[in-house]
Amino acid sequence: MGVEVPPEESNRCVRGCCRSAAIPLHLPPSSFSLLSPIAKGSESTVYEARLGGERVAAKKPVLSTSDDLDKFHYQLQLLWWVLPIELDHPGLARLVAAHARPPNYLMFFDFFEPPNLADKIHVEEWNPSVQQVVTIATDLAKALQYLNILGIVHRDIKPANILIDKDFHPHLADFGLAMYQKDIKHVSVENWRSSGKPTGGFHKKNMVGTLIYMAPEILRKDIHTEKSDVYSFAISINELLTGVVPYTDLRAEAQAHTVLEMTYTEQQLTAAIVSQGLRPALALPESGAPPSLLSLIQRCWDSDPQQRPSFKDITEELKIIEKHIAVNSCSLASPANKSQNGNTEVHHYQEALSWLNQGELFAKGNKLDSTVDHWSDIFDQSSKYCPTLSWGSFATCGRRETMEDTHFMLPHMSEEKDLHAFGIFDGHRGSAAAEFSVRAVPGFLKQFNSNTSPTDALTEAFVRTDIAFREELILHQKSKRITQKNWHPGCTAVTALIVRNKLFVANAGDCRAILNRAGEPFPMTRDHVASCPKERERIVKEGTEVKWQIDTWRVGAAALQVTRSIGDDDLKPAVTAQPEVIETILSPDDEFLVMASDGLWDVMSNEDVLSIIKDTVKEPGMCSKRLATEAAARGSKDNITVIVVFLRPVSTAERIY
């Protein structure tokens, strides 16, 4: 790797609890550089990086609490024992270095070109041969058998955590939830009550993983074992065989997410898996899968963990199945197969595109022909009141695996002291529309002058962004940079523009903005959802179907709840990007503005929000974080993004009542 490993006695983490003779645990800043992000979750971001001149993947954890830091050191201890260079296993993503000292805690792994197995199945719509499925299953089972021998339970096996190399060999990654079996049992014993069941605190820390891959005993709040990993393995291999997201009949993951929400609540799905024995639809014999493979999958997801085979048994059975598969099955190295399922040298798919860059480039490339004079020049400058702003934000994935929200804060926009802009974009069916919009909308706003009113500027920015994004999407689909079929990402949007003492808020969808006016909530937005009779009537007049599905009114085959958005080209023109703009004159009665995605408003009322800020130190970033974390604690199932803007001077030492 080109990075020297210090002597073991000095090669240790900042605490001294981690040490290694195989990999460096602290690195000089000049030896590595982080490039572009590859993936982002609630607990970490993975970057493409350079280490000693070589391409690697760098995992940067989110360390918000001392527990997070403890977890980093535990994971590092586990990884360098399991994955040091001298104990390399071909089925595991290899740890090659770490930086275990502040301020940049990092882990470096071998780099694998995207996509992971989940994106390979659901984005590229890869149809592997049965031979390929069995070979991948065998390699994965061997890696999990190796972990089991070492006494380790992975606890989060799913296609998204399986990396595929150029020869289609799998490499298990993301050991963020992995634990030694003895440690899981130790924690459980400490938390058991006289009833013999773990406490609620234990459940919250240990009922981890991804719901559709979690074994029934975990959903019943028992502890993880090797057999829990066996269950997740079976769900994943069946998904590879069928090509559909578990418990749906859809290939596209973003669309399947919507279908799952429409079909089951989380509690209903849990009950069906545990009590009714619900499992994903098993691959059909017509797929070419031998009965022995289908039988193995069914035994692996048996409701009784004791009836499931061990990974040692699974590996032996898969070897036998491999020998009996027809010789003329497509081999992993078949050039014809590579051509049919996607050239291995080209890894373009929708998330590989930088939609952030696309939005910024489009705004810059479509400048308006006008002389620049600013809105602040045309408003009454004799007004004695002008708000004094301080601002902050906080964003979290919440209970979702991926982050589809984006936001921007542009205080003193265009270097004007009385001109400020803030915005939140809540993506659905992927993050592409939200990423494009977060650069395009403020880019357009910067170009408008006093000949266009702020209301018209906001409206035009939304509409132009919508058109530009949909045209860009079509362009990339035609050029094959996007390979997924029937992909129609969109986002809701709320943007606030403060011009001297006037506030303008544009909204399309179900994000919200409220003012604290004289101690009472003053709404600056109205939700645009199909449950609103006026919005529903407008959609129907445009010729698009609105029907009651599961729990609410939804629009079209995509079953969207919102009736206005940027993107969603399959539902245009009914689901319009035309925002509703509300304006008001600010006064000393206006204390702060709160903007948030629906992940907050799903579990909090306007009054709740004001009350929480009242009881929080008056620092906008801290208030934003308090609101988001409280929403997560109340059970919000969505991404949560919050912006708080104080409109008059506040002291962080202000007394809390």
UniProtKB/Swiss-Prot annotation:
Residues at which Mn(2+) 2 binds: 426, 598, 638
Paired cysteines (S-S): none
Positions of ATP binding: 38-46, 59
Residues binding Mn(2+) 1, per UniProt: 426-427
Keywords in alphabetical order: ATP-binding, Hydrolase, Kinase, Magnesium, Manganese, Metal-binding, Multifunctional enzyme, Nucleotide-binding, Protein phosphatase, Serine/threonine-protein kinase, Transferase
Catalytic residues, chain numbering: 156
Cofactor: Mg(2+); Mn(2+)
Cofactor comment text: Binds 2 magnesium or manganese ions per subunit.
One function term, GO molecular function aspect: ATP binding
Matching CDD domains: PP2Cc (cd00143)
Gene Ontology biological-process entries: L-ascorbic acid metabolic process; regulation of intracellular signal transduction
Residue ranges of domain PPM-type phosphatase in the record: 390-647
Domain Protein kinase per the UniProt entry, residue ranges: 32-327
Reactions catalysed, as given in the entry: L-seryl-[protein] + ATP = O-phospho-L-seryl-[protein] + ADP + H(+); L-threonyl-[protein] + ATP = O-phospho-L-threonyl-[protein] + ADP + H(+); O-phospho-L-seryl-[protein] + H2O = L-seryl-[protein] + phosphate; O-phospho-L-threonyl-[protein] + H2O = L-threonyl-[protein] + phosphate
EC number: 2.7.11.1, 3.1.3.16
Entry similarity comment: In the N-terminal section; belongs to the protein kinase superfamily. Ser/Thr protein kinase family. In the C-terminal section; belongs to the PP2C family.
Protein name: Protein kinase and PP2C-like domain-containing protein
Organism: Oryza sativa subsp. japonica
Lineage: Eukaryota, Viridiplantae, Streptophyta, Embryophyta, Tracheophyta
